[in-house]
From Swiss-Prot:
InterPro entries: Nucleotide-bd_a/b_plait_sf (IPR012677), Ribosomal_uL23-like (IPR013025), Ribosomal_uL23/eL15/eS24_sf (IPR012678). It is found in: Plastid, Chloroplast. It comes from the Eukaryota. GO terms for biological process: translation. Belongs to the universal ribosomal protein uL23 family. Binds to 23S rRNA. HAMAP family: Ribosomal_uL23_B (MF_01369_B). Disulfide bonds: none annotated. One of its GO terms (molecular function) is rRNA binding. This is Large ribosomal subunit protein uL23cz. Part of the 50S ribosomal subunit.
């Protein structure tokens, strides 16, 4: 079973949200909020309060005369209950 999460995102906004117990991940665009919520709760052993998402467009690519683009993806902001945290990402707060 593929979990759908590509990687954690570390931008200025996502680092600011870490202080509010909100974690940001890029995920495959075909996964729903409930699937990602269920996977995060199982894998990290945390309680998820809410999941916000938005779809990011793919980037244009050019190889010689051929124009193409990369696939679009979805960014999820996962809000955890107070008292829970994802330990691998907590080091980035300090």
């Amino acid at each position: 079973m593929d979990n759908g999460i590509k990687y954690a995102v570390f931008t200025e906004k996502s680092l600011r949200l870490l202080g509010k117990n909100q974690y940001t991940f890029n995920v495959e665009s075909g996964f729903t909020k409930t699937e990602i919520k269920h996977w995060v709760e199982l894998f990290f052993g945390v309680k998820v309060v809410a999941v916000n998402s938005h779809r990011l467009p793919g980037k244009g690519r050019r190889i010689g005369p051929i124009l193409g683009h990369t696939m679009h993806y979805r960014r999820m902001i996962i809000i955890l209950q107070p008292g829970y945290s994802i330990p691998l990402l907590d080091r980035e707060k300090n």
